[in-house]
């Protein structure tokens, strides 16, 4: 093995508190590294070497470059010759940290990194760093421009120099700054010579490119070392090309040589026995000591390899997120940070495209059960996500068994099908041999147990080659009919459901496919290994995000998460929104009921949200962010939002056209809750059709507030019927407005004065005739009659209107109120007649179930009757049944007003939640 030469002024000896100069083989060993690289390149690429030797540079410049690059530093010694000073300790005393380019992006961030390292109480610390943010891309760009003979590579190199010089000046001072800038100048000079040679040759081999690119890590490691040294902490920095040895194993892949790397690390440590070591990420050497890199996510890989070599207690990878998400937060805003993952779960997620770790990063630490912790450098209070051997199972329920979801897009599904495949040995080998020959990557395989077909997923960009190869390979079989087809399905995606404990938990697949079915997602292929670490599903790419949201919401959101659409932000709707705002947090905390208002629709405008309207600002947003009202679009927004498992439309209007849509909404799987009486008191055939659909499906339709506002009238009636009681008669004061009017129509007060008072207090509609006509009471009578099993139409109910015939033609409410006093004498006469009999007047609705009739009328009741005891705007309903024949069951309470009506609607929302699984 060739010696790795290092300068005698190597920083190998750890910094003492006296602050010895920070030096490294970069001063000399880096030149010798270039020598090795250069000697290797001469054997590999004579044209490049010739270009460097014969480039048309001035002789003096050419000579200076070669002297600067190739001359070994005086006094250099080999690693093998270094005298052992200390053995490398191994075990839990080591903690390994890795900081990526974002963490090292500015002088302020490097200072923060130094603080984190210094605050770590571990006995020994090994810190792996990437190049500063964007620097690696800039270095690759340098090489690409140079070999393309683009002179602008010089400007890019100047940008690299300026970036590091500016950072160093902000971070360092005095001798530290002078030493770093001296080395930086020397490195830039060397790079200019190399890039000039590449420019002349028009070509750069991989090892030269790797050598150039690796400088970013060298510079960031030096700057961090100086920053830590400023605190007086002993520190060394390591060029990992001297330690990590890897073997190329394929395109953009390398395999670590752990034994040789361990030997070199021990020798390095014998010269540099520091308690804090700053190591370069990403870069390494081949067994021939040629510079190379660890390819994609190389710095994470470096940290994992080094962590395994020292058998560290933990490897912490610092990034800019709080940990590993349960799904891509760009696609699923409700994705949560996972506290733990097993190695296998992290591997599966990484394979299927989740931004966790590269799968190979996990391999080195698994052998020694070393945890990897993903943490956020910008939020150090967050504990992050721990990836370890077997995380503790907090609760063992179904949801806990599914840890995360990941997706891969831009795939194609290849299906090879034919009766001639069954029982024929070697068919699968022939299929995948053809795929291998064109270098395609098979991501998923699924085979029918009958062996009639095999399908597999490949990247869309590779499917044309795969299809051609399969048609060529099976030309005869296709012609003979042994294979029926080689089919390609384009524009596919994979959704992977990952969880270590899915194998031991029944119902995971059923729950997953139920969620996809409810989201109207068609599954094209399925694969699941016997280990059951993941369930892989192929589906249309256009359905992928919707499927991801539906699956994630089913496993990670509460079963009683409700996507709510409010139609009609008038008096009742506005009050309901305020009640939801005040109570939402309590419901989520105490009952795990998560209510999300996804939209608010008025008659002119509507407000839509994908994740939920902020109810503290809904009024303002309805003014500033609203769009023109469109009921179809509003409903589509709610029904197509499969991010939430349950959807409910709350109609707070009194609009007939809105009520006419209930059937269609229920058919789409949207629950409906309303105080709107129009649907249940409308045409009987529509009502029966609506109720039939409700009973035949698992979609709920609640309308408690249609009768009695917030009073439990409908639920009481249903309870009686469902327990086998027989309803004989329902009689009650159903109108809060008319209850108020007749409760106060006594003594010397005139009827018109009481109506005016009720109007002023807000008890009546803007036009009091809407209340006094009795139609609203008739609708409530119809609703109760139909609940009791009577097939009555609204026209079957005789109604005594309290609006005189002469006033029905008034063109406005004001005109009506002006003319109403002329009828006070008639009302006074009727009241006196009742008083003379010891009675009071009450406006009531009656359902006579026995005679199958209903009516609305003004009746007189004795003063000791419960109906005569009312006050304010209270409602009272008496149920006479087989069980409650002698003493009717009475429900009494406030039956009018926005608060109680909205409260009744709110109760229906909570009732729906309980039906969906909320605790009682």
Swiss-Prot record:
Binding of NADP(+), residues: 572, 604, 653, 677, 762, 765, 897
Keyword rRNA processing recorded: no
GO cellular component: chloroplast
Protein family: In the N-terminal section; belongs to the aspartokinase family.
One annotated GO biological process: methionine biosynthetic process
Pathway entry: Amino-acid biosynthesis; L-lysine biosynthesis via DAP pathway; (S)-tetrahydrodipicolinate from L-aspartate: step 1/4; Amino-acid biosynthesis; L-methionine biosynthesis via de novo pathway; L-homoserine from L-aspartate: step 1/3; Amino-acid biosynthesis; L-methionine biosynthesis via de novo pathway; L-homoserine from L-aspartate: step 3/3; Amino-acid biosynthesis; L-threonine biosynthesis; L-threonine from L-aspartate: step 1/5
Active site feature: 780 (proton donor)
Binding site for NAD(+): 572, 601, 653, 897
UniProt gene name: AKHSDH1
Residue numbers binding L-homoserine: 765, 776
Main location (coarse class): plastid
Enzyme Commission number(s) of this protein: 2.7.2.4, 1.1.1.3
Protein name per Swiss-Prot or TrEMBL: Bifunctional aspartokinase/homoserine dehydrogenase 1, chloroplastic
Positions with a binding annotation for Na(+): 704, 707, 709, 711
Region span, Interface: 342-566
């Amino acid at each position: 093995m060739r010696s790795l030469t290092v300068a005698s002024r190597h920083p190998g000896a750890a910094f003492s508190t006296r602050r010895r100069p920070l030096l490294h083989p970069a001063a000399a060993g880096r030149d010798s590294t270039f020598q090795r690289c250069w000697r290797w390149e001469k054997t590999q690429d004579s044209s490049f070497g010739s270009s460097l030797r014969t480039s048309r540079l001035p002789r003096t410049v050419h000579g200076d470059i070669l002297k600067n690059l190739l001359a070994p530093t005086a006094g250099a010694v080999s690693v093998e010759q270094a005298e052992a000073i200390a053995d490398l300790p191994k075990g839990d005393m080591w903690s390994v940290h890795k900081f990526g380019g974002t963490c090292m992006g500015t002088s302020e961030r490097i200072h923060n990194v130094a603080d984190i390292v210094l605050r770590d109480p571990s006995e020994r610390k090994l810190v792996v760093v990437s190049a500063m943010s964007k620097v690696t891309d800039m270095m690759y760009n340098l090489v690409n421009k140079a070999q393309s003979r683009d002179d602008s590579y010089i400007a890019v190199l100047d940008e690299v120099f300026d970036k590091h010089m500016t950072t160093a000046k902000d971070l360092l001072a005095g001798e530290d700054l002078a030493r770093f800038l001296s080395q930086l100048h020397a490195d830039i000079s060397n790079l200019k010579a190399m890039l000039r040679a590449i420019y002349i040759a028009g070509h750069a081999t991989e090892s030269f490119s790797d050598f150039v690119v690796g400088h970013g890590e060298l510079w960031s490691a030096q700057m961090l070392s100086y920053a830590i040294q400023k605190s007086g902490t002993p520190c060394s920095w390591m060029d990992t090309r001297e330690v990590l040895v890897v073997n190329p194993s394929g395109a953009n892949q390398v395999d670590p040589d752990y034994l040789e790397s361990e030997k070199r690390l021990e020798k390095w440590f014998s010269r540099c026995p520091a308690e804090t070591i700053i190591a370069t990420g990403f870069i390494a050497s081949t067994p021939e000591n040629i510079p190379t890199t660890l390819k994609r996510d190389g710095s994470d890989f470096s940290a994992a390899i080094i962590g395994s070599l020292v058998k560290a207690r933990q490897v912490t990878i610092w990034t800019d997120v709080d940990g590993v998400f349960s799904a891509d937060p760009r696609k699923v805003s409700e994705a949560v940070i996972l506290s733990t993952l097993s190695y296998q779960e992290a591997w599966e997620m990484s394979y299927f495209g989740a931004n966790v770790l590269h799968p190979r990063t996990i391999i080195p630490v698994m052998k020694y059960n070393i945890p990897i912790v993903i943490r956020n450098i910008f939020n150090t209070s967050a504990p992050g996500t721990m990836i370890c051997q077997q995380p503790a199972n907090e609760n063992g329920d179904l949801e806990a068994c599914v840890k995360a979801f990941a997706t891969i897009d831009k795939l194609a599904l290849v299906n090879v099908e034919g009766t001639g495949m069954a029982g024929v040995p070697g068919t699968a080998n022939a299929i995948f041999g053809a795929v291998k020959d064109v270098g395609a990557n098979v991501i998923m395989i699924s085979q029918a147990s009958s062996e009639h077909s095999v399908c597999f997923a490949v990247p869309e960009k590779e499917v044309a080659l795969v299809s051609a190869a399969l048609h060529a390979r099976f030309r005869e079989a296709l012609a003979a009919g042994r294979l029926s087809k080689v089919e390609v399905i384009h524009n596919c995606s994979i959704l992977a459901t990952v969880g270590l404990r899915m194998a031991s938990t029944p119902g995971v697949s059923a729950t997953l496919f139920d969620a996809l079915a409810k989201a109207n997602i068609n599954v094209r292929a399925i694969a699941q290994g016997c280990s059951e670490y993941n369930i892989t599903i192929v589906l249309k790419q256009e359905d992928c995000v919707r499927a991801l949201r539906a699956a994630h919401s089913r496993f990670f959101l509460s079963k009683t998460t409700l996507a709510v659409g409010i139609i009609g932000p008038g008096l009742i709707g506005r009050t309901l929104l305020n009640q939801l705002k005040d109570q939402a947090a309590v419901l989520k905390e105490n009952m795990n009921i998560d209510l999300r208002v996804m939209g608010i629709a008025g008659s002119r405008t509507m407000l839509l949200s994908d994740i939920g309207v902020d109810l503290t600002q809904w009024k303002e947003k309805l003014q500033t962010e609203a769009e023109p009202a469109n009921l179809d679009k509003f409903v589509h927004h709610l029904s197509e939002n499969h991010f939430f498992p349950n959807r409910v439309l709350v109609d707070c209007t009194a609009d007939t056209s809105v009520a006419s849509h209930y059937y269609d909404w229920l058919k789409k799987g949207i629950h409906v809750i309303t105080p709107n009486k129009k649907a249940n008191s409308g045409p009987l055939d529509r009502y029966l059709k609506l109720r039939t659909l409700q009973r035949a499906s698992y979609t709920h339709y609640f309308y408690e507030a249609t009768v009695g506002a917030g009073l439990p009238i409908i639920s009481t009636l249903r309870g009686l019927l469902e327990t086998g009681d027989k309803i004989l008669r329902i009689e009650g004061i159903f109108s809060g407005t008319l209850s108020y009017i007749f409760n106060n129509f006594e003594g010397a007060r005139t009827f018109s004065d009481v109506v005016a008072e009720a109007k002023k207090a807000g008890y009546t509609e803007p036009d009091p005739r809407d209340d006094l006509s009795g139609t609203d009471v008739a609708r409530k009578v119809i609703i109760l009659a139909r609940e009791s099993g009577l097939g009555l139409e609204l026209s079957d109910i005789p109604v005594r209107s309290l609006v005189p015939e002469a006033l029905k033609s008034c063109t406005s409410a004001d005109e009506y109120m002006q003319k109403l006093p002329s009828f006070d004498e008639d009302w006074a006469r009727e009241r006196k007649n009742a008083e003379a009999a010891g009675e009071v007047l009450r406006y009531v609705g009656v359902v006579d179930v026995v005679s199958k009739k209903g009516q609305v009328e003004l009746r007189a009741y004795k003063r000791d009757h419960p109906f005569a005891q009312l006050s304010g705007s209270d409602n009272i309903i008496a149920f006479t049944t087989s069980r409650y024949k002698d003493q009717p069951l009475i429900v009494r309470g406030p039956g009018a007003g926005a608060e109680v009506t909205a409260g009744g609607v709110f109760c229906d929302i909570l009732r729906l939640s309980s039906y969906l699984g909320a605790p009682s």
